[in-house]
Design a protein with these regions (language model features):
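N-terminal beta-strand motif that seeds the catalytic metal site of vicinal oxygen chelate
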Residues: 1-19, 65, 118-124
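Short, flexible helix/strand-to-coil boundary loops that buttress conserved ligand/catalytic motifs
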Residues: 25, 55, 79-80
Length: 124
């Protein structure tokens, strides 16, 4: 057994409009556990990330997050019920079964970060 044990890994997600993005993620279902003017720690259960008041278009346009959930359709219903796509003028598409054994949907946050929210399914 290695002595190099790990606890978790977190991404620093860029935000073009820090306050707007913080609200977006709260509407999506994340809680703000801690926040300053330049950084916020957000989590949902055991999943977390750091939202940073930092924006470079090339970074944001190529940044992706993947959230694995137990019920992707429940998450999609939540996104629709809260009107998140229209409220934030973002792109979001309904869940689809993928050939690699996942059912997921995509949404793009107000900064341009692509999120894939999905659940594992059995491959045909």
């Amino acid at each position: 057994m290695s002595e190099l044990e790990t606890i978790e890994i977190k991404a620093f997600v860029p935000a073009r409009d820090f306050a707007l993005c913080k609200q977006f993620y709260q509407d999506l279902g994340f809680e703000v556990a801690w926040s300053s003017e330049d950084l916020a720690y957000l989590h949902h259960g055991d999943c977390s990330f750091l939202l940073q008041n930092f924006y470079v278009q090339e970074l944001a346009d190529n940044f992706m997050m993947h959230l694995l959930v137990t019920d992707v359709d429940a998450w999609w219903r939540h996104v629709e019920a809260r009107g998140i796509a229209s409220k934030y003028n973002i792109n979001a598409g309904p869940p689809e079964d993928r050939p690699w054994g996942i059912r997921d949907f995509t949404l793009v946050d107000p900064t341009g970060v692509l999120w894939r929210i999905g659940q594992n399914i059995s491959q045909p």
